Regions:
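C-terminal motif of bacterial Sec signal peptides marking the signal peptidase cleavage site
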Residues: 19-22
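Asparagine-centered strand-capping/turn motif at beta-strand->loop junctions
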Residues: 84, 94-108
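Intrinsically disordered, low-complexity Pro/Gly/Ser/Thr-rich segments with frequent PxxP/GP/PP motifs
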Residues: 115-164
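Short, solvent-exposed loop/turn segments enriched in Ser/Thr/Gly
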Residues: 87-94, 192
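Bacterial N-terminal signal peptides that target proteins for export
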Residues: 1-10
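Bacterial signal peptide processing site
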Residues: 24-27
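Short acidic, flexible loop segments centered on an aromatic residue
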Residues: 103-121
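Low-complexity, acidic Ser/Thr/Pro/Gly-rich terminal tails and inter-domain linkers that flank the onset
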Residues: 30-85
Length: 243
C-alpha cells in the first residue's frame, strides 16, 4: 500500500474520532433525529422489503450482542457462523431453519438493515453481501457484526432484540456500498467504513477525503499480503457524554 493511501486512512480515522460521539450516546435523550443530528431515514429506514427464500424461516428472536471474536452472541444464542468484521457496535444473532430436503443458500444483501426494538439502541447494517449455506432439514445460527446507523444511540447489548428491516435505498449509504464493492474489508477498512456511514447517517454526507480513502482501499484479491502492509488503525469507541 502506498504512503498516500496510508495517510488518507489515518486522516479519515482521526476525523471520525474527533467529529463523532457515535455509538456511545448515554441513551437518556428522547430527542428526535433532527435534534440529535441523525437522518430521519435511518430512524425509520426505507427501501425494498427483504424476503427469506422459500423453505427458510426465522426461528425465534433476533438477539443483540456486544460484539467480539469469541464466536458467541448474547444469552440464548448458540455459537454459529460469524459474519462481518469484529469488533463492531451492533451485533445480531439469529437462527434460521431450512425445511427443504436439500441445502439452500441465504443471501444477505449489502444495505440490509436490522432495526432495534429499543429506540435507545443502534440500528445496524453492512456494506457487502454475505452468503450462508443452510443445510437441508437443519437449523443454522448466524452471528453478524454490523455497522451502527444512529450515532446518538447506544451500542447493542445482550438485552436487545431486533427485527429485519428493508434493504436501504438511502443514496448516501448506497454510495458507500458502491465505493467499497470488491475491496478488501479487514479491521482497519471496517473502521474507515464505519466512520463513512456515520458521515452519511449523522453528519450531512460523505466528504471528498472519505471518498478518496474508500477508493484507496486495496482490492479483495490482494488478500492477506495487503492486510499485513496496512497501518494498524482501529476506530475507538468514544466515551459517553458527561453532560
Amino acid at each position: 500500500m502506498t504512503n498516500m493511501t496510508n495517510r488518507l486512512l489515518a486522516l479519515a480515522l482521526v476525523a471520525f474520532a474527533a467529529a463523532t460521539g457515535a455509538c456511545g450516546g448515554d441513551g437518556s435523550s428522547a430527542a428526535g433525529p433532527d435534534e440529535a443530528g441523525g437522518s430521519p431515514q435511518f430512524e425509520n429506514p426505507t427501501g425494498a422489503a427483504f424476503q427469506l427464500p422459500p423453505g427458510i424461516t426465522l426461528k425465534g428472536k433476533i438477539l443483540g450482542g456486544e460484539g467480539g471474536d469469541d464466536g458467541n452472541g448474547g444469552d440464548g444464542c448458540q455459537p454459529g457462523a460469524r459474519l462481518g468484521v469484529s469488533p463492531t457496535y451492533v451485533e445480531v444473532c439469529f437462527t434460521i431453519h431450512n425445511s427443504n430436503a436439500e441445502d439452500d443458500t441465504l443471501r444477505l444483501p449489502a444495505g440490509l438493515i436490522f432495526i432495534s426494538k429499543n429506540i435507545e439502541t443502534q440500528n445496524g447494517t453492512q456494506v457487502r453481501e454475505e452468503v450462508v449455506v443452510v443445510p437441508g432439514g437443519r437449523d443454522t445460527t448466524v452471528i453478524w457484526e454490523l455497522h451502527c446507523l444512529n450515532a446518538h444511540r447506544d451500542p447493542s447489548t445482550e438485552e436487545d432484540e431486533f427485527t429485519i428491516g428493508p434493504v436501504s435505498d438511502h443514496p448516501g449509504l448506497r454510495e458507500v456500498i458502491a465505493l467499497v464493492a470488491g475491496k478488501l474489508i479487514d479491521q482497519p477498512a471496517a473502521s474507515l467504513i464505519g466512520g463513512a456511514i456515520w458521515e452519511v447517517s449523522d453528519f450531512g454526507g460523505l466528504t471528498d477525503e472519505t471518498r478518496d480513502a474508500l477508493r484507496a482501499l486495496p482490492p479483495a484479491s490482494a488478500g492477506a499480503a495487503a492486510a499485513r502492509a496496512r497501518p494498524a488503525l482501529r476506530r475507538q469507541r468514544p466515551d459517553k457524554p458527561t453532560g
